[in-house]
């Protein structure tokens, strides 16, 4: 029994690896591409796109302003013609960056929040709230937030709940 308490003390004081942290409920991580189906729903529901609209992904999305910055799709050669359906199946960053730009951060945050992201789930064992994407002054991060990058952090249980809500 003393060995158990000694090992427990060692594990509980390990702040770097945190071996006792329930990562499914209390770990928060950038959602990445797991957020794309929810962003697709938001884009369709808010009316910024339709199921039949086609975009051409050249592999590099350019921010439509005088700033001129942009981002690369994971497929540097581009996906070519993409619709919302092919953007989800091909995990097309270009498409979702454009949808994020069209919706803006406020709309994205509203939809993500409506799916329970950025809030505790209420499960009995407790969980982390995570955080919705933020908009630092002078920066438009909506294109990045739309495909799970930028500043948002969610727990795996939050994402599982959000995706279950989407498909039910």
Give the positions of each predicted feature.
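Beta-lactam-recognizing serine transpeptidase/beta-lactamase-like catalytic domain environment
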Residues: 1-33, 38-168
